[in-house]
């Protein structure tokens, strides 16, 4: 069922945006699905913030779910599978600039989370070969891993009552770091996939990023690909623990996000994609690059025109 290899994120469409009708109607259109399919991709990852699918009173918003149904239809029309990623839930966001807190302690927030996924299961549980569920984007702090292991396993239990075989993706803490996959509890479910994100070496992929604290990464620091240390050997070492954990537990690995900020040169970005792709391919790791359009990482942006035809070979 879960046989995807080459994907593209639709970041900024139903997440990390102003949620205006114009944004939701026009940021991504059918033409974009056609373009992604023409690149040889086999799936898209759709980040969704709860703001799109919940009303202010926390009831389910039919209009928002209808938008996701349409996105699935557009993907299927173009021969693409789709990962639904809950990018932000009530009481939690990976983004430190967003005022959300309490999810890991608050049972009310957790029940809303379960309710969202039960709805997704009702809508798409009959499509286990084409629609996959990613429960939550980028758990941040180490202190959250114990409650998160409990929460995601309860969520899987509730989904399974409705969608018994849909592949479900689960990531660990430090923003889905590949180094923390080993802290996920082994599930008694053959259709759980271990999920991670990879923006390493961070000083290269996030150079100049305005949202990264200055004491973590000086904003004026620039790092070329040749200076970055990004080699096949580097990524082999970085992924080793996660690969071993997945083998031990009989699970597949998936990289839900990876990419390079648009401050790096297109040529350096291409070089990075070539190297990480070699390791993905060697170990059979499915992946979805960040991101299709804008969001500081867009591979369809004009600046990438000269290298895009080559880059898409290495998605």
Task: Give residue spans per PLM region.
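Active-site donor-binding loop signature of nucleotide-sugar glycosyltransferases
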Residues: 10, 196-198, 292
């Amino acid at each position: 069922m879960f046989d995807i290899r080459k994907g593209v994120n639709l970041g900024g469409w139903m997440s990390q945006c102003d949620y205006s009708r114009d944004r939701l109607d026009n940021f991504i259109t059918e033409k974009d699905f056609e373009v992604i399919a023409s690149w040889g991709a086999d799936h898209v990852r759709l980040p969704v913030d709860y703001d799109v699918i919940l009303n202010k009173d926390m009831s389910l918003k039919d209009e928002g779910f209808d938008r996701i149904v349409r996105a699935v239809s557009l993907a299927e029309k173009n021969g693409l599978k789709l990962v639904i990623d809950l990018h932000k839930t009530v009481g939690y966001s990976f983004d430190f600039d967003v005022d959300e807190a309490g999810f890991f302690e608050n049972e009310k927030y957790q029940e809303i989370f379960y309710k969202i996924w039960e709805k997704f299961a009702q809508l798409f549980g009959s499509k286990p070969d084409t629609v996959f569920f990613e429960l939550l984007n980028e758990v941040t702090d180490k202190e959250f891993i114990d409650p998160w292991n409990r929460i995601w396993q309860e969520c899987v239990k509730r989904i399974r009552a409705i969608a018994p075989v849909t592949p479900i993706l689960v990531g660990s803490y430090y923003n889905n770091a590949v180094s923390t996959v080993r802290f996920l509890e082994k599930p008694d479910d053959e259709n759980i996939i271990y999920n991670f994100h990879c923006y390493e070496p961070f000083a290269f992929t996030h150079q100049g990023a305005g949202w990264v604290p200055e004491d973590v990464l000086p904003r004026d620091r620039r790092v070329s690909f040749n200076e970055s240390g990004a080699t096949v050997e580097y990524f082999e070492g970085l992924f080793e623990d996660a690969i071993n954990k997945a083998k031990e537990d009989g699970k597949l690995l998936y990289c839900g996000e990876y990419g390079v900020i648009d401050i790096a040169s297109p040529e350096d970005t291409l070089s990075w994609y070539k190297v990480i792709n070699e390791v993905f391919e060697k170990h059979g790791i499915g992946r979805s690059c960040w991101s299709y359009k804008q969001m500081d990482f867009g591979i369809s942006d004009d600046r990438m025109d000269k290298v895009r035809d080559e880059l898409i070979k290495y998605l």
